[in-house]
């Protein structure tokens, strides 16, 4: 019996040595950046706090430097930490490292659309989408007018709260939701519309669930966890429902399409489908158009909505900042004129506050994953083709030299000694390079105009003492999700 026990122990020991040997051979095949030694199957998952991955990556960067290798399960991952490394990857190596890493909750979007597309048609889909959005004024005068048209609806909904406590999640959300809906479908939703509310709830739920620990694990071990019960099933159902909604709208547009007149973004993409250049491409299908529309609808709504919601909470925490904004708005815009983008030149404090809100909330701390399109030399190391690349945006937005006291909310981070707006190249809230957010111009415009309009007409009133407001995100993962709260908006006199 004792001999049998010794034999089993020896076999286990030999098997362990063999696994380690095989793993070392795989690990040493390329001159990878340094990093912790991975275990078979689970990789370095034990060195990562799945409930706060960005914090874990920052700690590992202190140990291994600004470029290090990490295995999330069996997936080889290279992490970039700090302004220089992140900028180098996103801009200097934008062709080599511009692929999209897989986000398994969006498998139905794989090789389609813009955000999660890593297929042969991604570049053309993105190029076509950008040119079409430019035609519809993305970041220019056309979208300024769209936002200005939406402002009265937002103000009316806020007045409808009659100074009573309310949850701002979907009321605020309808503003950017309607702007992007107008671009995509030439459609406007009433703030009580149940379809619009349902879509927003799906957006909001997915944004939150994607940031939970379970979804982080699911993206690392999809084949193991896919058939188990869990919140990933809810996300997959939501993604499918949103895609179906977009496909229905695309088919409706197709049935009433006028080849000589474009009503909106969807019409433009459908018209391209009829042309020889794209019509013969195997990747350019109704399904690809539907996913492209779904990508833009989600990104164009939820990121701006969350930023606005977080922004109001921050302003209630710092009433002295709100007071300065009221003074600037009264001086430049007055009590009744609709805010305009030209006002930004005379409103450096509002411009600084908008930028500081985005920096401080650090909405997408680890960016969306990139992937190496080919073997790439980087600072003397090799990043092999297929390696996931994570440019950590939080390491840039919280750089201590560029932003003194980065953990504090300070609009002065974006003001010079004369009180004028000071742009920082470290402001990478929208990423950079070939995967930069296509809606950056629109989002900047919406945040400035919507916040200006709200504060032009209302004072924000917290239900608790400002010093007791907790700005800590309730969930950190795919995104940093703000805590739930209620507030009152009180009409300003005059």
Curated annotation (Swiss-Prot):
Its cofactor is heme. It is a peripheral membrane protein. A cytochrome P450 monooxygenase involved in the metabolism of fatty acids. Mechanistically, uses molecular oxygen inserting one oxygen atom into a substrate, and reducing the second into a water molecule, with two electrons provided by NADPH via cytochrome P450 reductase (NADPH--hemoprotein reductase). Catalyzes the hydroxylation of carbon-hydrogen bonds. Hydroxylates fatty acids specifically at the omega-1 position displaying the highest catalytic activity for saturated fatty acids. May be involved in the oxidative metabolism of xenobiotics. Its EC number is 1.14.14.1, 1.14.13.n7. Belongs to the cytochrome P450 family. Heme binds at residue 437. GO terms for biological process: 4-nitrophenol metabolic process; epoxygenase P450 pathway; lipid hydroxylation; monoterpenoid metabolic process; response to bacterium; steroid metabolic process; xenobiotic metabolic process. Changing residue 485 to H: In minor allele. PROSITE patterns: CYTOCHROME_P450 (PS00086). Interacts with chaperones HSP70 and HSP90; this interaction is required for initial targeting to mitochondria. The keyword Lipid metabolism applies. The gene is CYP2E1. Keywords: Endoplasmic reticulum, Fatty acid metabolism, Heme, Iron, Lipid metabolism, Membrane, Metal-binding, Microsome, Mitochondrion, Mitochondrion inner membrane, Monooxygenase, NADP, Oxidoreductase. It is found in: Endoplasmic reticulum membrane; Microsome membrane; Mitochondrion inner membrane. The omega-1 hydroxylase activity is stimulated by cytochrome b5. One of its GO terms (cellular component) is intracellular membrane-bounded organelle. This is Cytochrome P450 2E1. It comes from Canis lupus familiaris. GO terms for molecular function: 4-nitrophenol 2-monooxygenase activity; arachidonate epoxygenase activity; enzyme binding; heme binding; Hsp70 protein binding; Hsp90 protein binding; iron ion binding; long-chain fatty acid omega-1 hydroxylase activity. Pfam families: p450.
């Amino acid at each position: 019996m004792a001999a049998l026990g010794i034999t089993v122990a020896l076999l286990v020991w030999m098997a362990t040595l063999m696994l380690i040997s095989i793993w070392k051979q795989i690990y040493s095949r390329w001159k990878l950046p340094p990093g912790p030694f991975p275990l078979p199957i689970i990789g370095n998952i034990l060195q990562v706090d799945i409930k706060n991955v960005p914090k874990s990556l920052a700690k590992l960067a202190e140990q291994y430097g600004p470029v290090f290798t990490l295995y999330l399960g069996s997936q080889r991952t290279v992490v970039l930490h700090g302004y220089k490394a992140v900028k180098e990857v996103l801009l200097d190596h934008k062709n080599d490292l511009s692929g999209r890493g897989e986000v398994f909750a969006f498998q139905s979007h794989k090789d389609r659309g813009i955000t999660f597309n890593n297929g042969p048609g991604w570049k053309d889909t993105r190029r076509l989408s950008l040119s079409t959005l430019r035609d519809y004024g993305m970041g220019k005068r056309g979208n300024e007018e769209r936002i200005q048209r939406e402002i009265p609806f937002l103000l009316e909904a806020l007045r409808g709260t009659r100074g009573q406590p309310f949850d701002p999640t979907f009321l605020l959300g309808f503003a950017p939701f309607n702007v992007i809906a107008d671009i995509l479908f030439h459609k406007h939703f009433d703030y009580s519309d149940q379809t619009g509310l349902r879509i927003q709830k799906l957006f909001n739920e997915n944004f939150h669930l994607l940031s939970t620990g379970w979804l982080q694990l699911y993206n690392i071990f999809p084949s193991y966890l896919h058939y188990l019960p869990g919140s990933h099933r809810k996300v997959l159902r939501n993604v499918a429902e949103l895609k179906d909604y977009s496909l229905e709208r695309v088919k409706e547009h197709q049935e009433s399409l006028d080849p000589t007149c474009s009503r909106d973004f969807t019409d433009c993409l459908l018209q391209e489908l009829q042309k020889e250049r794209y019509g013969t491409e195997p990747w350019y299908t109704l399904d690809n158009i539907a996913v492209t529309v779904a990508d833009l609808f989600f990104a164009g709504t939820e990121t701006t909505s969350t930023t606005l919601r977080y922004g109001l909470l921050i302003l209630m925490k710092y009433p002295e900042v709100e007071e300065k904004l009221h003074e600037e708005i009264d001086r430049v815009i007055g009590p009744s004129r609709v805010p305009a983008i030209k006002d930004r030149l005379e409103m450096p404090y509002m411009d600084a506050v908008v930028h500081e809100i985005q920096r401080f909330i650090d909405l997408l701390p680890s960016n969306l994953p990139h992937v190496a399109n080919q073997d790439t030399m980087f600072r003397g190391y090799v990043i092999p083709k297929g390696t996931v690349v994570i440019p950590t945006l939080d390491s840039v937005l919280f750089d201590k030299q560029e932003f003194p006291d980065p953990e504090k909310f300070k609009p002065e981070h974006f003001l010079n000694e004369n009180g004028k707006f000071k742009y920082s190249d470290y402001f990478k809230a929208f990423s950079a390079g070939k995967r930069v957010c296509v809606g950056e111009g629109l989002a900047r415009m919406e945040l400035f105009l919507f916040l200006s309009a709200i504060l032009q007409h209302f004072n924000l009133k917290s239900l608790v003492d400002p010093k007791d407001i907790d700005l800590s995100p309730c969930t950190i993962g795919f995104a940093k999700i703000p805590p739930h709260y209620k507030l009152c908006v009180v009409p300003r006199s005059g």
